């Protein structure tokens, strides 16, 4: 019994979130999207806002990510991408840098990521070319791109 309790505590400690894990609710949300400068059409700038219960799409499609106006999407679409937060690299929260690589410098596009923690915004622009960014971002880049594809299908 003592061994089982010790094992249970050890598992809980190693799998539980530390203070850097992000949580989503109405105030804490994740904004994600991509942008391509040398591009024409609706898909050049796509930005979304994910909360714990809903997914929203930006209507403005502002390349800079400064002007955002969101409308709610259907619950089925939310369900397809609601786990994106699980792939968010916690290390990103402690980064001093806000730009990784050279997003869209060679027409390869970039990702716009923003996290709101009780109104405190942190934003990043990330190069789509994974050779130009830290390896801990690679899986998240892939997941963001996959989420955008799922939303638009």
Regions found by a protein language model. Give the residues of each.
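N-terminal hydrophobic targeting signals that begin at the initiator methionine
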Residues: 1-2, 18
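Non-transmembrane, membrane-adjacent beta-strand/coil modules in membrane-associated proteins
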Residues: 46, 86, 97-101
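Post-signal-peptide N-terminal segment of Sec-exported extracytoplasmic proteins
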Residues: 36-68
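A short-motif feature that recognizes glycine-rich, charge-decorated loops
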Residues: 58-93
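Short, well-ordered, aromatic-rich surface patches in folded extracellular/luminal domains
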Residues: 20-40, 69-76, 94-153
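C-terminal motif of bacterial Sec signal peptides marking the signal peptidase cleavage site
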Residues: 14-16
């Amino acid at each position: 019994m003592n061994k089982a309790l010790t094992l249970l505590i050890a598992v809980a400690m190693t799998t539980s979130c530390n203070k850097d894990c992000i949580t989503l609710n109405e105030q804490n949300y994740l904004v994600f999207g991509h942008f391509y400068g040398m591009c024409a059409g609706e898909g050049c700038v796509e930005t979304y806002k994910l909360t714990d219960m809903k997914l929203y799409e930006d209507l403005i499609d502002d390349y800079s990510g400064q002007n955002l106006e969101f409308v709610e999407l259907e619950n089925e679409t939310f369900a397809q991408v609601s786990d994106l937060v699980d792939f968010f690299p916690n290390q990103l929260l402690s980064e001093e840098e806000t730009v990784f690589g050279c997003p869209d410098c060679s027409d390869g596009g970039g990702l716009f990521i923003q996290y709101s923690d009780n109104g405190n915004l942190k934003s990043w622009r990330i190069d789509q070319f994974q050779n130009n960014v830290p390896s801990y971002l690679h899986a998240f880049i892939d997941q963001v791109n996959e989420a955008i594809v799922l939303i638009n299908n």
